[in-house]
Amino acid sequence: MANIKSAKKRAVQSEKRRKHNASRRSMMRTFIKKVYAAIATGDKEVAQKAFNDMQPIVDRQAGKGLIHKNKAARHKSNLVARINAMQ
């Protein structure tokens, strides 16, 4: 454990941020999994709705630095390609 007061404070802040980020990351991953699950069912409308729900969440987390913007773009590109490939 840190001895200096500012280091103790930083440790507390880091732990608080870690928990907050873990929660946000988990939520984002859940939205992404819902899109994959909708694609697996084969219903294009449901998959499109799930994608539309997921997209602003991923963009928001990328904007806040939780994930890199290129990773967000890669997720969206991959999922929209899978949705467009459906009949």
From Swiss-Prot:
Q: Name one GO biological process term.
A: translation
Which GO terms fall under molecular function for this chain's record?
A: small ribosomal subunit rRNA binding; structural constituent of ribosome
What protein is this chain from?
Answer: Small ribosomal subunit protein bS20
Location of region: Disordered: 1-27
Similarity remark: Belongs to the bacterial ribosomal protein bS20 family.
Provide the taxonomic classification.
Bacteria, Pseudomonadati, Pseudomonadota, Gammaproteobacteria, Enterobacterales
What does it do?
Binds directly to 16S ribosomal RNA.
Domain of life the protein comes from: Bacteria
